[in-house]
Amino acid sequence: MKITPKNHEKVFAKDELLVTKTDLQGKITYANRGFMDIVEMDERVLIGAPHNIIRHPDMPKIIFKYLWSYLQNGEEIHAYVKNICADGSFYWVMANVTPSYINNKVVGYHSSRRNPTPKAMEVIKPLYEKLLQAEKSGGISASEKLMNDLLKEKGVRYDEFILSF
């Protein structure tokens, strides 16, 4: 499903939690009503679909590289993500993604998303624009260098940086 982005932001309630679960390949196995409502897709479309069905083209790939690196090491991760809806509009989230276990074996991933704070968005939006520009001109390695330089300058890991807002 190819979605054409529109410059229209959607927001969801401050106390609302958007939840999805995926299998190890990133295919959606569960989505709560809040998630389905904001993306304007129902279970027939979402269940079994790759989670990147909602990936907005403005998202720098390096963020997902960090996400998968943490998850594959069995660690939870927090990330600010701009997602796309079925109608092309977008919404921002602060996502917390954790591995799901059965008998000490990772069987999938659980993502809970909240509204990001305005303070975080003041930093994240321009940062992601710079990362995306670097990616377009020099590939993912250029955006990775930019992000790593920022983290080194601040003396923090990615997760510490994200949780500092």
Model-derived segments and their meaning:
Residues 2-131:
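Sensory/regulatory domains in signal-transduction proteins
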Residues 107-110, 114-165:
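Juxtadomain coupling helices with adjacent low-complexity linkers
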